[in-house]
Amino acid sequence: MSLAGAFNAFKSSTLVSWKSTGKFQQTIASCIQRTGKALHSGEVTTVKICPEFAGEGRYFDFRSSFIRASIDFAEETPLCTTLCKDGLTVRTVEHLLSALEATGVDNCRIEISNSDCEGRSVEVPIFDGSANEWVEAIEQVGLKMATDCSGNSCEKLAPFLNEPVHVWKNDSFITAFPSPKIHITYGINFPQVPAIGCQWFSSASFDDSFYAKQIASSRTFCIYEEVERMINAGLIKGGSLDNAIVCSTSRGWLNPPLRFQDEPCRHKVLDLIGDLSLFARCGSQGLPVAHIVTYKACASLYRKLCFFCFILFL
Ligand SMILES: [Zn+2]
């Protein structure tokens, strides 16, 4: 069974109902463009985000090919979320997609390019390791109501969870409960890194300002002792103390101060929103309206969630 098939099952199952959010679909008011270094490839990449019609959703435009920001094209890759279609890949999409989902940019074209005119792969810039750069850029130009090509506004749907769902792998899990509003509770545990240890973060509510103030500025983190292994695996070629917070098992944080005492846990929430945004279709919300409780979740669990929905409800 393909991931696309599983998603369609999720979409048509009784587990979720696609209902109106009471809002209209939006897009960005005008284009924004940012250039920066990518974390894993180290390349310099330019991203231009442009307004799009309602119903078109979010999609990347790479080498004049369109790759929808959808679970249909998501690939499991180490340490980042990748979209892949027809041999073209766009890596590390999660922070950008998290910012677009959380701020309500439901429809947009994301042009992305690097200096390698022949390459088949491109990567979204990392900036400071958080979603701040994107949120600030979006706030600068603002949003507008998106209309379809006939000039009509379109209501924005969201997946509302009807029944509890629970998936797990070893000691990590994702549980989601029906809830009239989005709540996210996230736990991480690094017993071998005392400066991080066990952390839990729980969102009180989830409006745009909560994300901008409490989540967007939390940065990617990594364990110092794992950096060499990642470099040997061809990852984090663009990594530096400017685009991640680095923690040593014995010496604690190497580049303080943290922006939040529980910044690593908040960053996981940022990533989760980016990954769940891939459930969006045709300008809808991707993030399920539910109380989501996760502990040590990883990207593969989201896939498992998708399959879980298929197995149980068809
Ligand atoms: Zn991240």
For each predicted feature, which ranges?
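C-terminal regulatory domains involved in ligand/effector binding and gene-expression control
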Residues: 1-106, 111-314
